[in-house]
Each structure stands twice: as structure tokens, then as C-alpha cells.
Amino acid sequence: MKVNKIMTVKLLLALVIVFGATSCSKKSSSKSASSATGWKINDKKGGFQFNSKYKKQATSPGLVFVEGGTFTMGKVQDDVMHDWNNTPNQQHVQSFYMDETEVTNKMYMEYLDWVKNVFSPDEENYKNIYVGACPDTLVWRNRLGYTETMTNNYLRHPAYADYPVVGVNWIQAVEFSKWRTQRVNENILEKEGYLKKDAKITEVKAESSFDTETYLNAPSKTFGGDEKIVLRGRKGSLAKPKGGKDAKQPKNVYAQRSSGLLNPEYRLPTEAEWEYAAAADVGQREYNIYKGQKKYPWSGSYTRSSKRQVKGDQLANFKQGKGDYGGIAGWSDDGADITQVVKYYPPNDFGLYDMAGNVAEWVEDVYRPIVDDEVSDFNYFRGNVYTKNKLGDDGKVEIVTAENIKYDTLPNGRIIARNAPGQIAQVPVDEKETYLRQNFSTSDNRNYRDGDKQSSRNFDLGSSDEGDKIKDNQRMYDSPKHNVTTDSLGNMVRKYDKSNKRTSLVNDDVRVYKGGSWKDRAYWLDPAQRRYFPQDMATDFIGFRCAMSRVGPKADKKKTPRTK
């Protein structure tokens, strides 16, 4: 009897061991062999090569992970201003990353320093690039207030180094985000041995600056085609081979998108992302439900802290009342008169600082009075303009040079570079991409269903020969159209639109900004509040922070009953 029991136990153990070995074998072989063909992946003899060791997206400098989900976008409080521009609707955002703080003066000064060193304003071809990147420091001026100290010192003085940058328009914020993308990815490639060490400092110049898309699409043209930089890394073909009889030349000369090394681009957050991250309802989650609705980025209905040590202190930097920007001497409520150093106030439940107060923030979206949730309730965003790489006569991508930099003269007369040497020239998508396509039919979708010809009350089915053009007197949003021209001597001539028939300030060039600021009352601290401002203008109370999309799984952690 005992013998039978022993044999039975041994048999069961043998089966468990065999089953475990089989499953382990299957698990290990799934990465080394193709599930489609059974062929070996990453064979030393050649064939399909793939990064089977990729784990997850690395968190880029300055960012905090924000797990996506569903939420109620829009204002659920009383609309005392009667704007009626943020009706509640249910939206879902994917997981993403967002800057822990607003972009500071020190961060922006690093950008200006790089631009000035690479694109010297003393050279004729580049003289407008640096000037176009500089913030407008005159935004601090007040007709009936003495603010010259901020005008002269706020951006560059070390006392304000960790204060949020202001005077930056939406276009400049976008350009900063692009620059940041290139510098971070350039640093990654250097660390991984794909670029020559320190070349980003010692050998960078206007004609040979790094661009991520150029590196991925035409790597031999990166750094102006200088192979000494691109191929001198540890993994480059020009690198010195290791000694010994088994020394071999490296295979991976260039990193590719499939390498998984390069991160997605830094960008401005969409309005939906910003509002979701600011509200941080995750702090009130219990299992799969939010217990209540937040009025501010913190819990509770008041702007003051209830913690014993700091009881009564304001949780954000905002205007307390008429003529009161921070309380009385010796007992300041929020510790600031104007802006405040970042990380001064507690973060919200996502670990993000100053999502209410300090400065309002640009987001990516073009403004419209409604959020069209009938069309989209997933990653909602208005402002898509689809482009493609420009191809030359030889069928290869065309790289921007010093001779063909495109400049835009903004309605306010400022000149800003649209591209820079080393980048791939872009053109709008055309019929080749849109023919018989259902999800989009044109390059510019900023006014889709709200300002385009089809949504206009003057839309006439019989006038298709005019295409999508709308007559000036039939625009849904009849906003002013200022004009900037150049006379025969090259002087800029600025003309104001003095028509008294204009009915709106809304057009395709006004952008949403979110959150309250040091100049706003508590009403604007609600994450659902939305306002708009021309994308080419700046103020002393609007700053910005960057975001980055998440690739791969929604989250790294498993479900928990409550957020910890």
C-alpha cells in the first residue's frame, strides 16, 4: 500500500517537472523563434533581427508617468461666467508622461544658449532664429504699475532660475518641445555608443545639428552627412575593433525605431490630457469607481490646507482678492507676489506640481466653444495638421539647409523659423494619402465640423468647384485679419484690421490655455476651466509644460483596491 502511494507521488512529481520544463521551453523559445514561420530570430548568420530584450519605455528627463483612463471632461460646477464652453462629457485618455513641473527659466535659458551657439544671430542666414526663440520680456509692463524689475531680470537673473518661464507664445513652446526631443534622443544615442562621444558639444554647428527623424529616415545625412560623428560610436563601422582573434566589426551601425532606444517626441499636452492629469481623480478611486468629484487638483472644496503644521496656508499661488496677491507681511498666505519657485506647493495625486496656480499653461488644442464628443471620445484633440516628408527628384528625403529655411511672419510682426538645417522638409499630405480614405480627407483638420465649409450655414452643395475654401464674408468665426507686409526697402508694414463687422476672436490660430495663475482668482483653479489666446502672443501669466506619449502597456503595476 505504502509502495503504491510512493509511486503515485513520484509519478505526480515527474509530471509536474515535465510540464514545467515544457512550458519554460515554450516561453523561452517564443522570443528566439518566429511564431509566424518558425524561423530563428536574431540568427548570427542573418535573417530577421529584432530587439527581443526590450522591457519598457524609459522615463525621460523631467517627466512623471500618468496612467490613463476614463474621466468626466468639462465643468461640473456652476458656470457663473456663462461661457458655456466646457459642457461635461465622458472621455478616455491613453497613458502618457507629463513634466513634473512647469518649464522653468533655467530650462528655457539652456535652450536659448544652444540656439545662440549653433545658429549665431550674427550670421545673415540665421539672424532671425535666436530672436524668434526669445521670450517677450515686455509682457511684464503695466501702464499704471512699476514692473521694470521683472522686465529686466525675470528671465535671466539666477534669483528666478527655478521660476516658471513666461512671455512664451504657443509657437515658441512647441519649438522648445521639438528641441528638447532632439537633445534627449541625441544623448541616448551617445550613451548607447551610436554617436561619437561629446560630439553634441564639440562638433555641433548650424549645418550639422542632430534631428531624430532625419536619423531614423536618412541616417547617413545626420550631422550634415559627417560620418565621423555618426559612425565613430562604439557600435559604428568606423569604431576601432577590439583586439583578439575573435574581434569582429559591429553589426548595428545605426539605431532604428525597432531598436526601442529612442523615445517619442516631447510635445505640449492635449487639453484632455492636461485636464485629466490636473484633476488626478485617481486619488479618490476605490476599486473601479471614483468616489466623488474634485473641485481642485487636491481633495476638498477649499483652497487652504487642513494639515496641522500648515493649516490655513494656500495650496496654490493665485490672487486672493482685489489688491491682494499673497496676504500680509510676516504671514503670507501663499508665499508669493508674482510667480513662485516650482515645487513650492504640494503635488497632486499623480505627483505633478502647480497644476493649479502659479502660471496658466498652454496646451496643444485649437480652441472651439465645444468639445465634439460625438466624433471622438478617445484621446480627444482638435488641431491635427497631417504632413509628410518631402521627397527630392531622386526620390530621397529632402533635408533643410541654410539656404532653404522657411520663416513665418506672425500677425504681430515677429519672425519665427518654421524649420532648421538638418531637419526633413515637410509638405501637407495630398490625394495620394487621402484618396478613398475614411478617417481623414485633408491635411488641415483644425476646423473640422466647426468652422469648415461643411459646417458653415452658407454651405452650398452646388458650389463644389470652389473646394473647401470659404469666402471671407461667410466664415463661421469672423475674426479680425491683421496684415503684415514688406515695402520696397524691406521695411515691415503692419496693418490692423479696423473693420467694425468682426463678430469673434476665435479662429484656427487661437489655442487653449488651462489652469489658474498668480493673476487669477480661485474660480480659474478648477482643472475644467478653459480659455483661449492667440498662438503668436504671450503674457506674463501663461507658461507651459511638456508631455510625452506612452508606448506599450497601459501600466506596469497590477490592479490595486486603492491608489497608494
List each language-model region with its residue ranges.
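Catalytic loop of the DD-peptidase/beta-lactamase superfamily, centered on the K-T-G motif
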Residues: 529-532, 537, 542, 548-549, ...
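C-terminal motif of bacterial Sec signal peptides marking the signal peptidase cleavage site
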Residues: 20-23
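Short, P/G- and charge-enriched loop/turn segments at secondary-structure junctions
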Residues: 51-53, 83-86, 500, 530-535
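Bacterial N-terminal signal peptides that target proteins for export
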Residues: 2-11
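Functional-site microenvironments in short loops/helix caps that host divalent-cation chemistry
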Residues: 28-43, 65-66, 72, 77, ...
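Hydrophobic helical h-region of N-terminal Sec-dependent signal peptides
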Residues: 11-18
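A short glycine-rich, aromatic-capped structural motif
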Residues: 55-149, 161-184, 357, 543-544, ...
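N-terminal low-complexity, Pro/Thr/Ser-rich intrinsically disordered segments
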Residues: 38-56
